[in-house]
Amino acid sequence: MNNLKKNDKEVLEEFANLFPILLNEIKKELEKIDFPKESIHWIETVIKANSTGGKMNRGISVLESLESLNEGRALTRHEIFQAQTLGWCVEIFQACYLVSDDIMDQSLKRRGKPCWYKQKRPNSDQEVGLAAINDSFIIESCVFILLEKYFKNESYYLNIVELFHKTGFQTQLGQLLDLTTQPIRGDFSSINLKNHTRITEYKTAYYSFFFPVALAMLMSKINHEQAFTTAKDILLPMGVYFQVQDDFLDCYGSPEVFGKIGRDIEENKCSWMICQAILNGTPDQINLLKKHYGFDNPTDVEIVKKIYKEINLEKIFKDYENTSYNFLIDKIKTTCIYLPPSVFLKILSKIYKRDK
């Protein structure tokens, strides 16, 4: 039994130490089918490069949520291992979408390093390039190798496999919305908070917030529909709040701290920042934004950021952050009938006023 309460650093280290073991299991499965060594090395490199280096909040949330859901008793070593393994499945699952998202957005950096498609191929000076598309498929498939190996005999196996498929589909729908609601330059008719919220819920909130907690609930054999509804009602707004932070940091965050170079302005994104600028700007400012938003050159970007400063979007964001935090705290206190509030408070404490 695990009776000693670990601090955050110890939890992170223990979680990180499991990754090489799981990666080796994937390698062994590939060796069983006599796959070429060079190709196995490629797959190992792909998974390691894209699954590690982040904050690992989503993965660790599975274990932390399981602990909160089972307050009053210590988890067994087996339960801890299973939760950590599921957590890594979440992190690896996320990696496949980061790889494809960076290609579609033509991003340059991810977690402080060049995006995978911009990196050198294993044992080559050539860029990975569009081979990264297939790599994203492979990363996703490797998740199901791990799920089958470690959870096939669990009573909740089918439920977690279905949840992975459903979450993947929701994320893909979110990416579709993100790509197809990008307006024609100068046309702001589709840039509004309603569209922003819809994109965010599907692209970010489900897999980053609801997904890890729902996995812990399935491990705990919670099957009350209202419990899952409550979790969704709290975690989707939390995911929207998280994305708004991301949109703010995309513009104002330090690339060294944030881990990537923001490109929402250049890519004509339906970002919270431009939505607020349209709501709070003067007609002249909005006309200027229509002329300069969505163009990939420094002069246009600088003009957009200058207008953001004139509108004082930093203050608008800080007010939003405080309002959202209070809203979420109140929602947790008033709706947590079937689930302990600590499940959600722990997650909220990690993202409140974050800078990366």
UniProtKB/Swiss-Prot annotation:
Reactions accelerated catalytically: isopentenyl diphosphate + dimethylallyl diphosphate = (2E)-geranyl diphosphate + diphosphate; isopentenyl diphosphate + (2E)-geranyl diphosphate = (2E,6E)-farnesyl diphosphate + diphosphate
Enzyme class: transferase
Highest taxon in the source lineage: Eukaryota
Note accompanying the cofactor annotation: Binds 2 Mg(2+) ions per subunit.
GO biological process, any: geranyl diphosphate biosynthetic process
Co-factor requirement: Mg(2+)
Gene3D superfamilies: Farnesyl Diphosphate Synthase (1.10.600.10)
GO molecular function terms attached to this record: (2E,6E)-farnesyl diphosphate synthase activity; dimethylallyltranstransferase activity; metal ion binding
Sites where the protein binds Mg(2+) 2: 101, 105
Binding sites annotated in the UniProt record for dimethylallyl diphosphate: 110, 203-204, 243, 260, 269
Functional pathway: Isoprenoid biosynthesis; farnesyl diphosphate biosynthesis; farnesyl diphosphate from geranyl diphosphate and isopentenyl diphosphate: step 1/1; Isoprenoid biosynthesis; geranyl diphosphate biosynthesis; geranyl diphosphate from dimethylallyl diphosphate and isopentenyl diphosphate: step 1/1
Entry GO CC: cytoplasm
Activity regulation information from UniProt: Inhibited by aminobisphosphonate drugs (aBP), such as risedronate and alendronate.
Residues annotated to bind Mg(2+) 1: 101, 105
Disulfide bonds: none
Binding residues for isopentenyl diphosphate: 55, 58, 94, 111
Location relative to the cell: Cytoplasm
Keywords carried by this UniProt record: Cholesterol biosynthesis, Cholesterol metabolism, Cytoplasm, Isoprene biosynthesis, Lipid biosynthesis, Lipid metabolism, Magnesium, Metal-binding, Steroid biosynthesis, Steroid metabolism, Sterol biosynthesis, Sterol metabolism, Transferase
Function summary: Key enzyme in isoprenoid biosynthesis which catalyzes the formation of farnesyl diphosphate (FPP), a sterol precursor.
Identification of the protein by name: Probable farnesyl diphosphate synthase DDB_G0278823
Phylogenetic placement of the source organism: Eukaryota, Amoebozoa, Evosea, Eumycetozoa, Dictyostelia
